[in-house]
Amino acid sequence: TPTLLIGGADQPAKTLPDLVALCRAQPGKIIFGSAGSGSAQHLALEIFKARANIDVLHVPYKGSAPLMNDLMGGHVQYCFEGMTTATPLIQSGKVIALAQTLQQRSKSQPNVPTVAEQGYPGFEASIWFGMVGPAKMPAAMVQRMNQDIDRVLAMADVQEKLAQVGAEDGGGSVCLLYTSPSPRDGLLS
């Protein structure tokens, strides 16, 4: 599922270039929240800070719900958040979207430019959800569960619901996430 860089509706920077300029003009003063230290949203922020060469104040929360409340309330200014959480808030005008974090624009947010389009080629961040089981789970059971989940994810009504909130189904094996090289590999080392 893609992530979006979003801000409170009343924040001064409404585009990614304006936000970078604001962060450079006020180093360490612009407040970014995340769903928690080490979360996918926090990782997206740290990668973006490194790529854009900016310094911001990071405030980790205990999940997305309290972060979204404080973003809408003006206690934090910006954050990276999963499209499934951010989309209804964008549609209601409670937050604004500055950028999305996949290489190509998501179908559910076609008017929001990517971070890569706005001067940071190769930038990509996403959130994934998966099913896991015990280490010694029989291979036949793993295969059966994977097939059943893929079959459900292929259903038209499920695809429609996922599309409504900006979720993008990857399906398949979670092992690919761990064995495929990532453009992020080594970026923060």
What residue spans do the PLM features occupy?
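Mature extracytoplasmic/periplasmic domains
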Residues: 158-177
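Short Pro/Gly-enriched coil loops immediately N-terminal to beta-strands
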Residues: 1-2, 91, 122-127
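Hinge/capping helix and adjacent helix->loop/strand transition within the periplasmic-binding protein
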Residues: 1-66, 115, 128-161
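Ligand-binding "clamshell"
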Residues: 54-55, 89-100, 107-119
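Alpha-to-beta junction loops
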Residues: 26-29, 72-81, 94-96
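Short helices/loops that flank or line small-molecule/ion binding pockets
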Residues: 47, 51, 65-75, 84-92
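Beta->alpha turn/N-cap motifs
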Residues: 64, 81-86, 101-103, 127, ...
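Conserved small/polar residues in nucleotide/adenosyl-binding loops
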Residues: 178-183
